[in-house]
Amino acid sequence: MKCLKTLLVSTTLLTAFSLNAEVTLEQQVKITEEGLHFDGRNLDFSNVGTPDTGEKYDYFFGPNISAHGDAVKTYRHYVFMTWYKGGKNERNVMLSRYNTLNGELSTIEFPHKHTGFRGDPLVGESHNTIGLSVSPINGTIHMVFDMHAYDNNNHGGKFKDDFFRYSFSVAGAAELPHSEFTLDKFVKDTSEVSQGDDDYKHLTMTGDLDDKGNFARLTYPKFFTTVDGTLLLYMRLGGNNNGAYVFNRYDAETESWSTFTKFNENNQKLKGNQYNWGLYGNMKYVNGKLRVGFQQRSNDNSDKYKYQNGVYYAYSDHPDGFGDWKNHKGEPMTWPLINSDEIKVFEPGDYISHTEANSVYIVGSFDWTVTEKGDIHIISKVRSTDRGRADYEEVYIHSYKPAGAEEFIISTDFPGASEIYTSGDNVYIVGLEGGRPYVEKAQGGTNNFIRVYEASDGPVFDHGTLYIKDGKVYYYLMERTSGTAMPLYLQIIDLDLESDANAPIVSFPSPSVTVNQGYEKLSLNISAESPVEGRSIQSVSLYIDDELVRTDDSLPFLFGHGSKPHETGALGWLDRHEPNPSPLSAGRHVFKAVAVDSEGDSSTATMILNVNSNAPIVSFPQESLEVDEGFERLSLNISAESAVEGRTIESVSLYIDGGLVRTDTSLPYLFGHASKPHETGAMGWLDTHSPNPSPLAAGSYEFTAVATDNEGEETTASMLLVVKGEPEPPIVTWPNSTVTVYEGYEKLAITIDAETPVEGRDIQSVTLFRNGELVRVDTRPVWNFGHSFAPYEFGAMGWLDRHEPNPSPLGVGTHTFTAVARDSAGLESETDMALIVLSLPGPSVMINEGDISLLTEYQNLAITAEASAADDDISLVSLALYIDEQLIREIYEPPFIWGSDAYSTELLSLTEGTHLVRVVATDSNNKQSESSIFINIDLLGDLNKDSIVDKADTRLFTSKLRAGEIMDIRYDFNGDGVVNNRDTRGLVRRCTYSRCSSN
């Protein structure tokens, strides 16, 4: 056992702040000699097709796969660890259990072997980690492993029905005796997609194959345990610049998992956002809540960020994260999130000066945590993309928000780290230095890290991953040796949280205070007491921005009182107070109180003082502006006003890259107006303007406005002007900007045209995206997609005998395909094609007759129709005749005739009035179409259309006869073959009322 007891002095606090800590290495145990490690070349897309076939194990992304990811967890007195077995030809998934009480080690070997990068076992992939958890409620073991955004179709279909890998044990397996801790305690897959009798991998976590779409395209499994023992799993859905975090929940009572729920939407552009984006960070369950912290990678390749930008943070007040999501200020956010700006904390890219496209590199050294009392800590790093540039910059950032504070404190006084952890109210940096573990500690809500543990002997480690539980670090490490099989160790390090419980309790009256510049008084009564009976507070020291103000050794611990008015930065408020010669300037200041008790234990509290400026308020119309080289006009109306009543603005001066342009002493403060068109670098735009002899050339320029008020106070504002020269990116085009197909289409192959207009350059790649999701990167011409070896790329079903039907064809709607061409200079162009998938049309059907008019007592009526299917592969099932929504008869083969032959009377019962006739055709796809006509049945004898036959009709009948109008032969009531006056008696007999002749 190794113990290092230290008393260290923080460089930021000089000699005033010390921290006692006794951190001990409790146990170290070797888990195996055979942890899989990739010892070969780091491949890329140019050589991944030719990996080493010998002993060396080439890899993609990184060399680590064992002791990597979510690979170590605890359950009661056991520590569980996952790993892959080395060497190169083994690769089995392994699970080890260490009994911390008796030192017993149990290991299970699973049949599954690491499948390698995109299914090539000769190329290792570091992203295919094994996530691990044990339910504290029922003792089931859960593992999700060996996947990187796979689905049924990508990578040539290599992962069909095997794109998600989940293994789980029976209840109670976690604490079985050593002899019973065996593979048979895990549940086999007996579903229809099982790969055999030794298949312990399940395609879904719900047990329902109908849910398999919910488990596709996932990466980076990580489990959490909530305060009530519920297991949660989170993973990343999708790709690097178009992704989402998803999570699900385990119900220990029913031993079942839910489907995945999204924290944020992917394909954000389709949902109204300006661009698609992915997440680089973590979802964590800390301090009793599910939380998310990440950096964003957008698909904008023309901004100053090479990959990621920003720091984003959110948390959920729902016990399991299913709703009630908020930003760090407690404001509700859209859930699932679409616009990441709703939860943005700050921009690390603002901490270096580069502005050119792809010049800022924010990758790695990002992590975050939250202490038990609610202090939020986020670490990040920003540097120049080009390490060789003369003005190379690199900044490590620690942003933290003490519990109760309203805003983050952003500190660049931070040496940097890759991960940050928490236990109790402290934050920790745990890592390797010279291959040996060390621990640094800071009180939550502070930036005061000191080293409390470091190993000076023992094995030299290559890397590791860790889990902290109940004040102990379970550090799972791989020893640095050689080959494709290297030893794995577990170290258990006690963080000595018990001593922290004895530390003093210290606090400011408020976590944050806002005052105006020139404030006269700020008195702070700092509360400090010991939680341990018999101890007393020896002193309280106040620091402002890490500078010691004073140490007070007696109650009350009051700073800024009448005898010391200046120590809190105030001017003074009594007549006897001389004005403070060094008052606090406008801006944010960190006040820190350090309490030390009679045993030498100490604690720290912080307060943020925001000092509002009295200086003028000045601003450009916008912070940055892009124009094309040779721009004709740039007029800038600079806003300037005093923040103090009674003061006025004396002048506003404009500078370009430090050179004075002009000082304006009267409103409006307008530069680049018609009388001075050249002063902002423009060419001029009026006929009276001669061309600018010295226009601003392509490049970036800093415009600075300096506003001065009548008291001589100044304020500066800046604007970045980017003058864009003519870029010459590749030219990429589709054969057609819009393609229309019918659902179920078998084939769609398209060759994309890509070329560079610049001599000496060539096209390096053409990348195809479907609705924002990566389809494939093609690195050699011709740029053909959807060909016979990749028939599904445009969503087609497949057309050759060897093509299995596409299980995920594109549905009805409009789909956007984006082609991105990249040339040898790194310039990119993109163009979109709209693929419109139409619903298969129903059959065509037509009633041959037009609208029909009949009289009651009609004797004959037949209706005929013709129909055909929309496609040769579709058959016609039936035609059905409806009259007034009443089915008359359905006919299953032509001829389609109603009212003839054996059915001659089926249409003879229509009553007086108008009837809707519909013929509905149905095809073998259950698609339907219809044709319709109207049949109008008039009352026989009702010549004036008043719905009765009466004397008026007989008179009209006689009148029509006299006028020689042709009458319907059905009015030949006496059957002599003509309609004449002798038929009047027959009409009278049809009168609606009796005694028609007397009406």
From Swiss-Prot:
Positions that bind Ca(2+) 2: D300, D303, Y305
Sites marked Neutralizes the sugar carboxylate group at subsite +1: R236
Source domain of life: Bacteria
Binding site for Ca(2+) 1: D189, D199, K201
EC number, UniProt record: 4.2.2.-
Signal peptide: 1-21
EC class: lyase
Catalytic residues as annotated in Swiss-Prot or TrEMBL: H127
Matching Gene3D superfamilies: Dockerin domain (1.10.1330.10), Immunoglobulins (2.60.40.10)
Annotated GO biological process: polysaccharide catabolic process
Keyword Lyase: yes
Binding site for substrate: S126, H127, Y280, R297, Y361
Molecular function GO labels: lyase activity; metal ion binding
Keywords: Calcium, Lyase, Metal-binding, Signal
Annotated family: Belongs to the polysaccharide lyase 24 family.
Function description: Ulvan lyase involved in ulvan degradation. Ulvan is the main polysaccharide component of the Ulvales (green seaweed) cell wall. It is composed of disaccharide building blocks comprising 3-sulfated rhamnose (Rha3S) linked to D-glucuronic acid (GlcA), L-iduronic acid (IduA), or D-xylose (Xyl). Ulvan lyase catalyzes preferentially the endolytic cleavage of the glycosidic bond between Rha3S and the uronic acid GlcA, but not IduA, producing oligosaccharides that have unsaturated 4-deoxy-L-threo-hex-4-enopyranosiduronic acid (deltaUA) at the non-reducing end.
Name the UniProt record assigns to this protein: Ulvan lyase, long isoform
Protein species of origin: Alteromonas sp. (strain LOR)
Lineage: Bacteria, Pseudomonadati, Pseudomonadota, Gammaproteobacteria, Alteromonadales
